[in-house]
Amino acid sequence: YKNLAKNEKGGKENSKEKSYENDNEIESNATLVTEDINSNILQIIYFDFDKSELSSISKKEIKKFLEKYENVISKFLIVGHTDTKGTKEYNYKLSIERANVVKNLLIDLRIKEENIKILGKGEIDLNIKTNDEVPHPANRRAEISPIN
């Protein structure tokens, strides 16, 4: 089991040991790489508040992820998520945008579109439970999982 978070500046943090109290405590567009066969989620990409753009470090990490698993995984599920800030409808659309951004990068990296499924969950399935309208960076993410 490997759990590693990299921030924009290239530093490393153990994501399981730190809780983020506000938006400023997690660096912009951090990428969490997990390798846990039991979790089935192999890559988590975090997003800035109200954004769906990938940082250059996130793009590099996704590329490394694909290179590592290119002979093992051929089909992918990308699930987009948001925090609870904003309306449920807006957050659902944003979660779809986040999943699509990751999907488009996978296509650019030569994964066939028919081998990628996306799902938007909006503010359902939060990593960190919060009250409505409370932003939390750990909830703003897209998860990449293999499809068997």
Positions of the model-derived regions?
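Periplasmic peptidoglycan-binding/tethering modules of Gram-negative envelope proteins
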Residues: 1-76
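Periplasmic OmpA-like peptidoglycan-binding domain that tethers envelope proteins to the cell wall
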Residues: 59, 81-148
